[in-house]
Amino acid sequence: MEKFHNKDADMRTANLLSNLYNNLSNTYLLMKRGNEAAKALRTAFDIRMEYAHWGLAESHDSLQQMMNLINMLLLAKDVDNAKIVLEQYESLVLEHLSDTSLDYGICKLSQGIIDMMEGKPEPAEMNLLGAENIIGNAVGSDNDYMKTTYRYLNNLYARWKKPEKAIAYRDKFLGVKQSVLNQLE
């Protein structure tokens, strides 16, 4: 692949090369080789940044690919690599979008999930409530992102022995879940 990574590469070649490294990253992840997955993803984004003058770094596909990897790393309980990728994701969102965008809300949601996995209830609450606010302002409350946020807040408060809040977020989760199901009919 590296023979295509040169000073004469055009936008299409650079984009394809970046996508190849992203796919390699996903392959490593499926093989449960988290360090190699993170390294390949970093290479994919380094290529995008190297050719940023063509707008490759600003591609929303890049953000979606990063978030998919973060989610997979979290499912694999590879929190350290998830934090590395999330840091890059957050930097791109803040540089090219804003701290009120849906993408930043998703960033706060992911950070809240990481905080929960690390047993840090106070930062988890702060990040999940931030996600609830940002996502709600960006796209409303009737969507899967908000449903996920409510589910994690319910779980957090149940673990943290705050039953009133846990019940409130359970009810919000069930309300959004039913609304989303109704939209599918």
Kindly give the residue locations of the regions a language model identified.
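Helix-coil-helix junctions within alpha-helical repeat/solenoid scaffolds
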Residues: 113, 117-120, 126-129
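Hydrophobic positions within repeat-based interaction scaffolds
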Residues: 141, 147, 154-185
